[in-house]
């Protein structure tokens, strides 16, 4: 409901609309004066009555009525000095009743006014209490919630920064370990290639050793065959020598003196020497060749043995390095897995803490929103109380004007009913006056905003009945 409608409705409720009766209007009082004239020609009293009504705007409502009475006795005329005091008694009784009703209405108005004053005081006290609570809530909410929110935000930022630094440090360590692992893997690949090359070289050396062993065996067989051939030739030579010696002994007796015969012994000796020299030379050459071959093969075998021993040593060294690198790789894998597990746990903890912080932030924001809504509700209640207070102030001012008007009306002198102006009047000659009721309606509209009056208008309406 707007301020204008509240003010208008309260004003209409207090003063009544165009259709309200005189009994329901508690803010209207009447003073009735009556004048009656008589004529001696006929008994037709003419009554003129004026009613003055005080309204909130200071206007007066006037009612005039004329009553025409016709009698069945047209020839009777009253004297001027004969007075009927029953009319005065009726007027006094009506005035007393009016005054009694006015007193009752004034008492009711005073009671309502006292109730309104008590209500206004109570509402003002409630307004002060609500204002104090509002100020207290503003101060406490701003100080407590703001400080708590800022402190928690600083703590959250600090933890987020710490977790970010820890995460960056772990990522750097992980990158370093990954680089070390890559370097060790490259080194392992190189060592494995060198090992394969050494094994291939060793295999070739083994092939050479096998070939040398086969060549040595072949040479040994050749030496044995040559020795057997030399023994056979020597045996054959000895047999030939023995045969020749036997032939020489058999033909020794047949000597021709006349003919000079060659020296067979010298020839045989020469042949033997020649064969011996050839055999010795062949034997020497065979021994030299065998010795040279054996020396070459021995030297090659020694070289191959040295190379094999060196290859074995290198292979053992490579094997030890491979084992150590494998152990180191396994250790690094374990360390990497543990670091990755720790990193996952830290990420999960970080996500959980971030979710908790988000929940805390959301809860604090909800509390802040609830506090804002509560403050807005208190402000609306305060605005409603201000509107009610303004309406009550307007009603109090209206009652004050009514009371002042009533006091000013009561202070007027009362009419003297004993000195009535009676004169003789012919009622037949008087025109018939229609009964009319004139009423002035004052509509006062007050617009307020934030407890301040921004517009005030008044309208007067004159109605006739």
Curated annotation (Swiss-Prot):
Top-rank taxon: Eukaryota
Sites bearing Phosphoserine, chain numbering: 5, 7-10, 21, 25-26, 34, 39, 42, 46, 48, 50, 54-55, 65, 71-72, 82, 86, 143, 213, 225, 298, 324, 408, 411, 418-419, 429, 437, 458
Annotated positions of the Phosphotyrosine modification: 52, 60, 116
Region of interest (Coil 1B), ranges: 153-244
Protein location: Cytoplasm; Cytoplasm, Cytoskeleton; Nucleus matrix; Cell membrane
Linked residues for Glycyl lysine isopeptide (Lys-Gly) (interchain with G-Cter in SUMO1): 444
Domain IF rod: 102-410
Chain segments carrying region Head: 2-94
Residues recorded with modification N6-succinyllysine: 119, 128, 187, 293, 444
Pfam families associated with the record: Filament, Filament_head
Site (Stutter): 350
Residues with Phosphothreonine modification: 20, 425, 435, 445, 457
Region entry Disordered, spans: 1-57
Locus of motif [IL]-x-C-x-x-[DE] motif: 325-328
Region spans: Coil 1A: 95-130
N-acetylserine sites (modified residues): 2
Name of the protein in its database record: Vimentin
Source organism of the structure: Mesocricetus auratus
